[in-house]
Amino acid sequence: MFRTLVKTESMALESQTVSVRYFELRTLRGGRRYSAEIWLAPGDRVILDGDSVVNLEARAARLVPATVYSRLLAGRANAA
């Protein structure tokens, strides 16, 4: 089973840009599944799975800001 790149986009949050790549995967039964690979930093990524690219785009739009800001807060807490 191979993934096919369907779409790429960048999301800008204040001073950071996050890369999002969307893939399509054919299942053994001929169905289609989709995944989004969100690159937050080198070696730091989040992978989402879904039934459609539209669904993944909506989930990524909500998840990316929350993830970036929570990691910023966690970094500040560790520095203090």
Regions found by a protein language model. Give the residues of each.
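Negatively charged, low-complexity tracts enriched in Asp/Glu with abundant Ser/Thr
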Residues: M1-R21, A77-A80
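Mixed-charge, Lys/Arg-enriched low-complexity segments
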Residues: P42-A80
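N-terminal targeting/docking segments
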Residues: K7-E9, L25, L56
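Intrinsic-disorder/low-complexity loop/linker signature
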Residues: S10-S15, G30-G31, D51
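Terminal alpha-helical segments
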Residues: L5, E24, T67-Y69
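A short, structured beta-strand/loop element
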Residues: S19-L48
